[in-house]
Amino acid sequence: MGLELPLVLGTSSVFRREQMERLGIAFQAASPDFDETPMLGESAPQTALRLAEGKARSLTGRFPGALIVGADQVAWCDGRQWGKPMNLANAQKMLMHLSGREIEFYSAVVLLNTVTGRMHRHIDKTVVVMRQLDELHILRYLEREPDAVYCSCAAKSEGLGALLIERIESTDPNALIGLPVFRLVDFLKNEGVDVL
């Protein structure tokens, strides 16, 4: 494949690691050390891109001479940003609120070449329309898909979360999982990495 610089995925997300593994190229995952608190007045796409860039930049000291991938996703609905519920009670409340609503997911990916300083950036917008949900269906879903509490809006689309979704509009179906793979492949090619 001719990969000269090591490839590092800056994430603690098991879902993003799985997405990278499916590409079949050698990489190392490393947890970034970066404050992910949204800034006041920041739009969802701005937050996603700032966090993706920050994650990549936070790893430059540990991985000089590398290609570093940073990614983040921010959901937007009802005039505010939504994150990961992180526990069952929050997931139940979140899914009840989002029932029947349209959610915009902004998935940002960056590729930083630490040798040249060049950074490739992209934000992918995915629109998800949730089905009308009741408490019983939400409880059953969360019992069968416990990892959903670690997903944005508790909607694990690559698993049983697909049952909660009425419609998805996207140019890259991978972006909703957390990593816009189509654009990442382009970025890697631009840096001399052929994934095939």
Curated annotation (Swiss-Prot):
| Protein role | Nucleoside triphosphate pyrophosphatase that hydrolyzes 7-methyl-GTP (m(7)GTP). May have a dual role in cell division arrest and in preventing the incorporation of modified nucleotides into cellular nucleic acids.
* Family matches, as HAMAP family: Maf
Q: Name one GO molecular function term.
A: nucleoside triphosphate diphosphatase activity
Q: Using the UniProt record, name the top-level EC class of this enzyme in a single word.
A: hydrolase
Q: Where in the cell is it found?
A: Cytoplasm
Record key words, sorted: Cytoplasm, Hydrolase, Nucleotide metabolism
Catalytic residues as annotated in Swiss-Prot or TrEMBL: 72 (proton acceptor)
Catalyzes what? N(7)-methyl-GTP + H2O = N(7)-methyl-GMP + diphosphate + H(+)
Q: Which cofactor does it need?
A: a divalent metal cation
Question: Got a GO cellular component term for this one?
Answer: cytoplasm
Query: What protein name does the entry list?
Result: 7-methyl-GTP pyrophosphatase
List the Gene3D superfamilies hit by this protein, alphabetically: 3.90.950.10
Record-level GO BP terms: nucleotide metabolic process
Please state the Enzyme Commission number of this protein.
Answer: 3.6.1.-
**Where is the site labelled Important for substrate specificity?**
15, 73, 158
- Tagged with keyword Cytoplasm: yes
